[in-house]
């Protein structure tokens, strides 16, 4: 299996989660400002909600790299506790990309909300999420 990890972040919360997932998968987590250099079977894509909205650059990244992505696995951080999975799934399907049925989300710190998150417990959960998917895929 060929994996990649890409993320969009403003605060650094999603980057922390992405780096931990990348560690499990043996790949470097990359900001979505960078194109995917090659085709991947599974792209773990991290994004965030800002004032209950996703950033449009995530959608543009998916469109631009659609030919290099087999399946997207979504993960997200948010001060509100909500997930970006529904949005990412819609973007994936619109571009003919499969969407993995399970996603990961954890709280992210923002101003007075969720200070210190994601914490070590959250990052361990992210690593376990990636390990479980690898195991399910027989990798």
Please describe what each predicted stretch is:
Residues 3, 9, 13-28, 39-139:
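FMN-binding flavodoxin-like domain, especially the glycine-rich phosphate-binding loop
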